């Protein structure tokens, strides 16, 4: 809905348009007990690939990218670190990232996303990782 609203509201613009969609590395990697999340993010990535193709057909089409922002300290992280290892075998990996200080803050992730949005090559790859 937001992508359609953006496209409709800016379709008449002759200047550059960019759309950044927040995805996840889990859209590209399967993980036990996270099927719905992984599938949702994978669908978002593929939607963005299709959207990029649609926009490329237009004279002033928007550049779009579904960006994996890295691992961020969120409520989801808290839930994953507290999950039963019998159903979430990756729990130790997430606990380790927290213990080693490898989780980005939401503010840091937002800053990295904005920096990615301003890269000269933004939109060349419709699905990317901020760590690329």
Regions found by a protein language model. Name each.
Residues 1, 20, 44:
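Catalytic Tyr-X3-Lys loop
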Residues 3, 40:
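Active-site helix of classical SDR
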Residues 8, 53-57:
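Alpha-helical segment proximal to the catalytic Tyr-Lys
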Residues 14, 29-33, 55:
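Flexible, glycine/small-residue catalytic loop immediately N-terminal to the helix bearing the conserved Tyr-Lys
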Residues 20-21, 65:
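Rossmann-fold scaffold of SDR-type NAD(P)-dependent oxidoreductases
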Residues 24:
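Residue(s) in the substrate-gating loop at a strand-loop-helix junction
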Residues 30-38, 50:
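Active-site loop-to-helix junction immediately N-terminal to the catalytic Tyr of the SDR YXXXK motif
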Residues 62, 66-69, 74, 82-132:
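C-terminal helical subdomain
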């Amino acid at each position: 809905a937001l992508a359609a609203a953006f496209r409709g509201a800016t379709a008449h613009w002759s200047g550059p348009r960019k759309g950044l969609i927040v995805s996840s590395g889990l859209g590209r990697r399967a993980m036990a007990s996270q099927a719905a999340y992984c599938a949702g993010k994978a669908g978002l990535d593929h939607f963005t690939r299709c959207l990029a193709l649609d926009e490329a057909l237009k004279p002033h089409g928007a550049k779009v990218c579904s960006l994996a922002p890295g691992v961020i300290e969120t409520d989801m992280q808290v839930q994953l670190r507290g999950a039963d290892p019998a159903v979430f075998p990756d729990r130790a990996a997430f606990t380790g990232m927290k213990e080693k200080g490898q989780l980005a803050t939401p503010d840091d992730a937002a800053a990295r996303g904005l920096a990615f949005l301003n890269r000269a090559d933004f939109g060349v790859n419709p699905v990317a990782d901020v760590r690329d």
